[in-house]
Curated annotation (Swiss-Prot):
Record region (Ribokinase): 1-318
Keyword Acetylation among record annotations: yes
Task of the protein: Catalyzes the ADP transfer from ATP to D-glycero-beta-D-manno-heptose 1-phosphate, yielding ADP-D-glycero-beta-D-manno-heptose.
Organism expressing this protein natively: Shigella boydii serotype 18 (strain CDC 3083-94 / BS512)
Family affiliation: In the N-terminal section; belongs to the carbohydrate kinase PfkB family. In the C-terminal section; belongs to the cytidylyltransferase family.
Pathway in which the depicted protein is active: Nucleotide-sugar biosynthesis; ADP-L-glycero-beta-D-manno-heptose biosynthesis; ADP-L-glycero-beta-D-manno-heptose from D-glycero-beta-D-manno-heptose 7-phosphate: step 1/4; Nucleotide-sugar biosynthesis; ADP-L-glycero-beta-D-manno-heptose biosynthesis; ADP-L-glycero-beta-D-manno-heptose from D-glycero-beta-D-manno-heptose 7-phosphate: step 3/4
GO biological process terms on file: ADP-L-glycero-beta-D-manno-heptose biosynthetic process
Cellular component annotations (GO), alphabetically ordered: cytosol
EC number(s) reported in the record: 2.7.1.167, 2.7.7.70
Superkingdom per UniProt: Bacteria
Gene that specifies this protein: hldE
Residues found modified as N6-acetyllysine: 179
NCBIfam families in the cross-refs: cyt_tran_rel, PRK11316.1, rfaE_dom_I, rfaE_dom_II
The name this protein goes by in its record: Bifunctional protein HldE
UniProt xrefs under CDD domains: RfaE_like (cd01172)
């Protein structure tokens, strides 16, 4: 799979919210304290990382986008440490200093990759005059493509409704990572990104995906939202929009070490991708990939462009270009936006041979992207008989995905890929063999959409059936 990432360097995003400093003390533990039944940690490493809204801004800047951060801090060492750390990663800070309050700081003590305790140093900023925050937002609205409001219920977003209205008047999308159960505060936002627990705290326990969709759509209507993205941990994330089918994306996480800051990564990547001119569906695709990376790291973390590109491309153990149908639709939409011609073909591809490779290479030359749709094992049995397939679906898709000519591989359960093709609507539908174009599944739908249908020849003498027969004859001999 060959992926072109968004042009993040042209994206401008402002983050407003509760900024904090995350401190980490690391060290070995080898004994219990004589003073109390607690472990003694010999601290040998100290780290300081921006957290809360500051971590969102770091995630945006790490992709190469222009990130501006506005929030409330004290006048203390923590505020200075925050400013320095953020300046080092190209985040432009414009803090409002409140001399009567400390900068929010969270100290974590860790040993052997385990967090032993967290200590919080904070006083809420409720009651602080929000006007300086409003002024900073107003000054930036003409030069940003998205506004992120990062709510940790520490007081910086006490006037969140006024902030939403400022952005709406300027036509700037507002993305909010909500806190608490009072979603009335966020009325009129472009997108809310609650996790499943936060979502269920508002709408009630959801036993099925259908309930998530039904209650999510009601929440969108009740609070005049443009969209809702529910992050669902190991079950991925679900994007809901009025008038559109729900988009459920499976998680891409391989290992989960720490979910700290994962929500910051999701909303940060969403905002940067939107501000770069991409659709919400495309933004969710990138955010889902980024979340899969960041939960594999310890502590609040960011995702680099290279890490994101590798995650989007897929890892070797998932078969490179192997995709779900929903992921494929997003990839095709992104390709079309870049003006690329999408070619699609299908088949069983049971025992891959020279004829297959030559055919796929020729098909790829006809466009910019090649999709290969593969019959599932059950579909293959119905088509070829009980002795087939020789190779199970997963192996067939992995081999196809490894070919240079192939961009994306997807499976289908039906006898023909007509439904799948109708959903993708490639620019060019290709089939190998001696078919007539009108006999090819999906041809009518492609033609109706203004696309083309073409029949290509296989190499003479190359067929899976002939290979199987030869193997059987050799065994008898």
């Amino acid at each position: 799979m060959k992926v072109t990432l968004s042009e993040f360097e042209r994206a401008g995003v402002m983050v407003v919210g509760d900024v904090m400093l995350d401190r980490y003390w690391y060290g070995p533990t080898s004994r219990i304290s004589p003073e109390a039944p607690v472990p003694v940690v010999k601290v040998n490493t100290i780290e300081e990382r921006p957290g809360g809204a500051a971590n969102v801004a770091m995630n945006i800047a790490s992709l190469g986008a222009n990130a501006r951060l506005v929030g409330l801090t004290g006048i203390d060492d923590a505020a200075r440490a925050l400013s320095k750390s953020l300046a080092d990663v190209n985040v432009k800070c414009d803090f409002v200093s409140v001399p009567t309050h400390p900068t929010i700081t969270k100290l974590r003590v860790l040993s052997r990759n385990q967090q032993l305790i967290r200590l919080d140093f904070e006083e809420g900023f409720e009651g602080v005059d929000p006007q300086p925050l409003h002024e900073r937002i107003n000054q930036a609205l003409s030069s940003i493509g998205a506004l992120v409001l990062s709510d940790y219920a520490k007081g910086a977003l006490a006037s969140v409704q006024q902030m939403i209205q400022l952005a709406r008047k300027a036509g700037v999308p507002v993305l909010i990572d909500p806190k608490g159960t009072d979603f009335e505060r966020y009325r009129g936002a472009t997108l809310l990104t609650p996790n499943l627990s936060e979502f269920e705290a508002v709408v009630g326990k959801c036993k099925t995906e259908e309930e998530i969709v039904e209650r999510g759509m009601k929440l969108i209507a009740d609070y005049e939202l443009s969209a809702l993205l529910v992050t669902r941990s190991e079950q991925g994330m679900s994007l809901l929009q009025p008038g559109k089918a729900p988009l459920h994306m499976p998680t891409q996480a391989q290992e989960v070490y720490d979910v700290t800051g994962a929500g910051d990564t999701v909303i940060g990547v969403l905002a940067a991708t939107l501000a770069a001119g991409n659709s919400l569906e495309e933004a969710c695709f990138f955010a889902n990939a980024a979340a899969g990376v960041v939960v594999g790291k310890l502590g609040t973390s960011t995702v680099s462009p290279i890490e994101l590109e590798n995650a989007v491309r897929g890892r070797a153990d998932t078969g490179f270009g192997v995709m779900t149908e929903e992921e494929l639709k997003l990839a095709v939409a992104a390709a079309r936006k870049r003006g690329e011609k999408v070619v699609m073909t299908n088949g069983v591809f049971d025992i891959l041979h020279a004829g297959h490779v030559s055919y796929l290479a020729n098909a790829r030359k006809l466009g910019d992207r090649l999709i290969v749709a593969v019959n599932s094992d059950a579909s293959t049995k119905r088509l070829k008989g009980d002795s087939r397939p020789v190779n199970p679906l997963e192996q067939r898709m992995i081999v196809l995905g490894a070919l240079e000519a192939v961009d994306w591989v997807v499976s289908f359960e039906e006898d023909t890929p007509q439904r799948l093709i109708a959903g993708i609507l490639p620019d060019l539908l290709v089939k190998g063999g001696d078919y007539k174009p009108e006999e090819i599944a999906g041809s009518k739908e492609v033609w109706a959409n203004g696309g083309e249908v073409l029949v290509l020849n296989f190499e003479d003498g190359c067929s899976t059936t002939n290979i199987i027969k030869k193997i059987q004859q050799d065994k008898k001999g």
